[in-house]
């Protein structure tokens, strides 16, 4: 049984990447540079705009983050796809938090809008995930809407983020 806490530290998230947080069958988060959050500050099973669950996480920004040195030289900006990936990561993390087992795979997104950017001068990125639907049966899948904020301003929105958990990804 997964111990459900309402927040997780960077060390907890790194343990998830090693397969230690949710046990051998639970979905791991990416490790190293691809882990796009420093902490989960809130998780609820019945909160959010649809009362189906809510996750809020944060990433501390500093000019030394790996992507600023290569995207783009002379014009550093966090790639928008990394913010999108962070939202998918959090959907999968939530499914593991609920006790779902398998390897997480992004299955799609309805619509993504970018209305701002993350520059090296920013201090903090916040991710907010509002679940619309969660299926925990033979099929394990989450559908959610998400927002990315930089220093309190919404800069990306995504509707219908979909993540599934798969015990066998060979035929995926």
UniProtKB/Swiss-Prot annotation:
One of the protein's GO biological processes: unsaturated fatty acid biosynthetic process
Positions of the catalytic residues: 71
InterPro entries according to UniProt: FabA, FabA_FabZ, HotDog_dom_sf
Catalytic reactions on record: a (3R)-hydroxyacyl-[ACP] = a (2E)-enoyl-[ACP] + H2O; (3R)-hydroxydecanoyl-[ACP] = (2E)-decenoyl-[ACP] + H2O; (2E)-decenoyl-[ACP] = (3Z)-decenoyl-[ACP]
Location(s) in or outside the cell: Cytoplasm
Pathway(s) annotated for this protein in UniProt: Lipid metabolism; fatty acid biosynthesis
Pfam families: FabA
Origin superkingdom: Bacteria
GO cellular component: cytoplasm
Single annotated GO MF: (3R)-hydroxyacyl-[acyl-carrier-protein] dehydratase activity
Keywords, in A-Z order: Cytoplasm, Fatty acid biosynthesis, Fatty acid metabolism, Isomerase, Lipid biosynthesis, Lipid metabolism, Lyase
Enzyme Commission number: 4.2.1.59, 5.3.3.14
Subunit description: Homodimer.
The protein's role, per its UniProt record: Necessary for the introduction of cis unsaturation into fatty acids. Catalyzes the dehydration of (3R)-3-hydroxydecanoyl-ACP to E-(2)-decenoyl-ACP and then its isomerization to Z-(3)-decenoyl-ACP. Can catalyze the dehydratase reaction for beta-hydroxyacyl-ACPs with saturated chain lengths up to 16:0, being most active on intermediate chain length.
Family designation: Belongs to the thioester dehydratase family. FabA subfamily.
Protein name: 3-hydroxydecanoyl-[acyl-carrier-protein] dehydratase
